[in-house]
């Protein structure tokens, strides 16, 4: 967790870029450094003209975090299309995952009339992989 320190661009199929941004929340670093990451992310997101879509990654084991809700609100206020990917699904039972996603839906419903698309994922078991890749394909075909 909290390993990305730079903006990393990955060219996919010689056609589009997947951009990995530093995390703005949890990171094993100083508060000052996290604040710098937050500014880098916000500047990039607000100034990137060719961005098709943004994925907000959130640890499914945690309650909806204030910083995530604030970031999502900023995306909405600026008309930036996004979806939420809940990570580390392998760490919870199916019932726990469902409860966690429902808590996040309820928290987002306080701010949003229409909820963003949400995916549950696990890198350990490839959970959600096909759905996310399919969604990326839909976004790129627009």
Please give the residue ranges for each predicted region.
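Switch I (effector-binding) loop of TRAFAC-class P-loop GTPase G-domains
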Residues: 1-14
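Amphipathic alpha-helical transducer elements in NTP-driven molecular machines
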Residues: 4, 34-38, 69, 126-129
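Switch II (G3) loop of P-loop NTPases
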Residues: 15-39, 59-62
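Conserved nucleotide-binding/hydrolysis micro-motifs of P-loop NTPases
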Residues: 16, 23-25, 61-63, 88-93, ...
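Conserved ATPase-coupling elements of RecA-like P-loop NTPase cores
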Residues: 27-32, 63-69, 94-98
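Inter-motif core of Ras-like GTPase G domains
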Residues: 33-61, 73-85
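Canonical P-loop GTPase G-domain recognition
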Residues: 91-142
